[in-house]
């Protein structure tokens, strides 16, 4: 049975970018419809991405902490892992959050349409549910938040159930004895953390000379030193062939770490994501989509068609939920007639591994590429009382300052729960703070958070928790 809906705004996709845009539109008094292919709101992030992976990472952390509790005189027997119960726990987390979104959509009177949507013209789209039943949506304005999907390589037999993408890995159907992860990025390393804790022998193959290539090498080096105790990293090595056989998946590699064919019980392909721009017939609405599937927008998130906007993964890197949320707010407010635009100074990035690798603002490699006059200040967690007491002293807080103005350009943290410490650094960059502003802010002791203030003291030459390389310089200047 076909239906037709007329609305002021339709949002295509209900991930963090999409539902944030829809809810903001509704809050601003706009009649809003949201179209989503999943049976629940939340998109990839809540259903098969950010949230379920964090639930499993929490399980992994509990397992690892129990293993090492004997250092403090607490002894646990070998954990008995019931996959069905672990899976149920993960799904309960997802259900709680997606259920909350459904309640908020209802409270805001946002109409939810389930189905895959495609444009038919610049003011119409059609969403088809699982049975093929169409719902036609006539709109004044549209916000495209159609997201992205995992990259698939033509030489890999992706149809084999032992070859996974990130969605498959999160299903937790089994714990393979030997798991290869193709790609040393955030998604691959997070899932490697989970499966290693659950009992898999994990190997990671990465083309670049470091994992998490976007982060600075000194930051990643601290992570690498710890993770190599758990699973094997094969850097500067590429996969040349993948063959599925009855007794396993055979992967041929060549490069610095391996020139051989190895057998695995499962392979996780985590080499990035591609935008869904070519899957929604955007061209029928007049919206331009580039060869890669991205839709280009201006600072108000407008496409080349003035009443059609795009947000989230589909508009370009970084493909991060928190970026998409802010883009969604901008699009909604512009449609409502407000003067708003998207121009953040910083977008934080976090690998929720153990330890976490997190950074915000400019990296040191970016400063070098841009020819900036900068200075780095580092505070090692080996000098942090809280880190030592919490047995996570193999970490570091790093700040990057403009050498002339002393303003904060960027920062990175590697350590347990390091991502939780990024907020102050991001705010400092947005507000134009300098090193003195941070150093003179009293940070609670003992906390991991105080490492940010102590790194600023290193730059200022006022540090007393470490040998002060600038002490003599300061005395002379007086």
From Swiss-Prot:
- SUPFAM superfamilies reported in the protein's UniProt record: FAD/NAD(P)-binding domain, FAD/NAD-linked reductases, dimerisation (C-terminal) domain
EC code: 1.8.1.4
**InterPro entries the UniProt entry points to:** Class-I_Pyr_Nuc-Dis_Oxidored (IPR050151), FAD/NAD-bd_sf (IPR036188), FAD/NAD-binding_dom (IPR023753), FAD/NAD-linked_Rdtase_dimer_sf (IPR016156), Lipoamide_DH (IPR006258), Pyr_nuc-diS_OxRdtase (IPR001100), Pyr_nucl-diS_OxRdtase_dimer (IPR004099), Pyr_OxRdtase_I_AS (IPR012999)
Q: Which residues bind FAD?
A: 36-45, 54, 117, 313, 321
Molecular-function GO terms, alphabetical: dihydrolipoyl dehydrogenase (NADH) activity; flavin adenine dinucleotide binding
Record's Pfam families?
Answer: Pyr_redox_2, Pyr_redox_dim
Q: Which residues hold NAD(+)?
A: 183-187, 206, 239, 270-273
Q: Which GO terms describe its cellular component?
A: cytoplasm
UniProt keyword Flavoprotein, yes or no: yes
What are the disulfide bonds? Answer: 45-50
Q: Which domain of life is it from?
A: Bacteria
Listed under catalytic activity are: N(6)-[(R)-dihydrolipoyl]-L-lysyl-[protein] + NAD(+) = N(6)-[(R)-lipoyl]-L-lysyl-[protein] + NADH + H(+)
Q: Which Gene3D superfamilies match?
A: 3.30.390.30, FAD/NAD(P)-binding domain
Q: What class of enzyme is it?
A: oxidoreductase
Q: What else is known?
A: The active site is a redox-active disulfide bond.
Q: How does it assemble?
A: Homodimer.
User: Briefly, what is this protein's role?
Assistant: Lipoamide dehydrogenase is a component of the alpha-ketoacid dehydrogenase complexes.
State the family it belongs to. Answer: Belongs to the class-I pyridine nucleotide-disulfide oxidoreductase family.
Q: Specify the protein name.
A: Dihydrolipoyl dehydrogenase
Taxonomic lineage of this organism? Bacteria, Pseudomonadati, Pseudomonadota, Gammaproteobacteria, Pasteurellales
């Amino acid at each position: 049975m076909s239906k037709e809906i007329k609305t002021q705004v339709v949002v295509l996709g209900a991930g963090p970018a999409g539902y944030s845009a829809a809810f903001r539109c509704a809050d601003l008094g706009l009649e809003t419809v949201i179209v989503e292919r999943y049976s629940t709101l939340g998109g990839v992030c809540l259903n098969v991405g950010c949230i379920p992976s964090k639930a499993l990472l929490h399980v992994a952390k509990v397992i690892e902490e129990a293993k090492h509790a004997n250092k403090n005189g607490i002894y646990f027997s070998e954990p008995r892992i019931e996959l069905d119960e672990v899976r149920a726990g993960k799904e309960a987390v997802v259900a709680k959050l997606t259920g909350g979104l459904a309640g908020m959509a209802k409270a805001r009177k946002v109409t939810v349409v389930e189905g895959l949507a495609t444009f038919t013209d610049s003011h119409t789209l059609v969403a088809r549910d699982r049975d093929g039943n169409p719902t036609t949506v006539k709109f004044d304005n549209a916000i495209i938040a159609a997201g992205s999907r995992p990259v698939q390589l033509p030489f890999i037999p992706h149809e084999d159930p032992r070859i996974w993408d990130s969605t498959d890995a999160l299903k937790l159907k089994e714990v393979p004895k030997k798991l290869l992860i193709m790609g040393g990025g955030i998604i691959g390393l997070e899932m490697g953390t989970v499966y290693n804790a659950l009992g898999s022998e994990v190997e990671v193959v990465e083309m670049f000379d470091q994992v998490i290539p976007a982060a600075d090498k000194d930051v990643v080096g601290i992570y690498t030193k710890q993770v190599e105790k758990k699973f094997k990293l094969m850097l500067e090595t590429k996969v040349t062939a993948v063959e599925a056989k009855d007794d396993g998946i055979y992967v041929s590699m060549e490069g610095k770490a391996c020139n051989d064919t190895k057998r695995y019980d499962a392979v996780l392909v985590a080499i990035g994501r591609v935008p869904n721009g070519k899957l929604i017939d955007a061209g029928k609405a007049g919206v331009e989509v580039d060869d890669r599937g991205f839709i280009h927008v201006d600072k108000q998130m407008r496409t080349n068609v003035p009443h059609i906007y795009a947000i989230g993964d589909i508009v370009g890197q970084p493909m991060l939920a928190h970026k998409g949320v802010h883009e969604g707010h901008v699009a909604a407010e512009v449609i409502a007639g407000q003067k708003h635009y998207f121009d953040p100074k910083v977008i934080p990035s976090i690998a929720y591994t153990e330890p976490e690798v997190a950074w915000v603002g400019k990296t040191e490699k970016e400063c070098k590429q841009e020819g900036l006059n900068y200075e780095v200040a580092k505070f090692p967690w080996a000098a942090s009382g809280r880190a030592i007491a919490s047995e996570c002293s193999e970490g570091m807080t790093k700040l990057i300052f403009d050498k002339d103005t002393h303003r904060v350009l960027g920062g990175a943290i590697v350590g347990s729960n390091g991502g939780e410490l990024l907020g102050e650094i991001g705010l400092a960059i947005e507000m134009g703070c300098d090193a003195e502003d941070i150093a003179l802010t009293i940070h609670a002791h003992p906390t991991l958070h105080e490492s940010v203030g102590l790194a600023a003291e290193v730059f200022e030459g006022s540090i007393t928790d470490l040998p002060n390389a600038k002490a003599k310089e300061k005395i002379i200047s007086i």
